[in-house]
Amino acid sequence: RVTSPVRKGITMEWFQAALDRYKQQHHQGHAAPKPERTHSMRSVPAPIVYTRTRSVQVPEPVLREQRIMAGFDAGPFVDAFKILRTQVMHRIREKGWNVIGVTSPGEQEGKTFTAVNLAASIAMDVTQSVLLVDANLRHPSVHEMFDLGECQGLADYLLDDVPIEQLLVHPGIGRFVFLPGGRTVSHSAEALTSPKMLALVEECKHRYQSRMILFDLPPILQTSDV
């Protein structure tokens, strides 16, 4: 079982207010004009050449449509996740953690949106690398955030022994790699509590101590998976 150090209060009231302002601008179609791009505007580190990981260059229009912060230069939406990153990183360094989970009470409450953007914001720090694991095997959706079709992932590793190296995806954002959920698994609680899953979590924790591991978990009140 993955225990998340991210608590309800860590986002703070202004974080929700910033997201509300962004959503209002987004829906009304009055977003601030996009400034001219310069190399100094973003804190994205230099690209890494991934030789063993599948690399997919997600177009910027897709990032913007899906509200992934790497597609934006500035604004309250970007600032909100940068400060959430600061709060989370401070807490996990204080506790000595490198694995965290993101969940929600129910479905359609923005947990995958939050997990992807938190991972992206951490990966845009030149000193950090991030692995995001889609562990919501009943409804895997991290790959959909990047407009990718159905692909193999965690379920295929757990059930069919497909090597992890063949499943990882680099979406062209800093030092960000994600493991898709793969095919839908109806009895996901058994898969997520299997010895193989526990071994994977332990390996991630100890083999990649300099990398942050985020798990996009199932809703906490609707299934027995978390």
Regions found by a protein language model. Give the residues of each.
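P-loop NTP-binding module
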Residues: 1-226
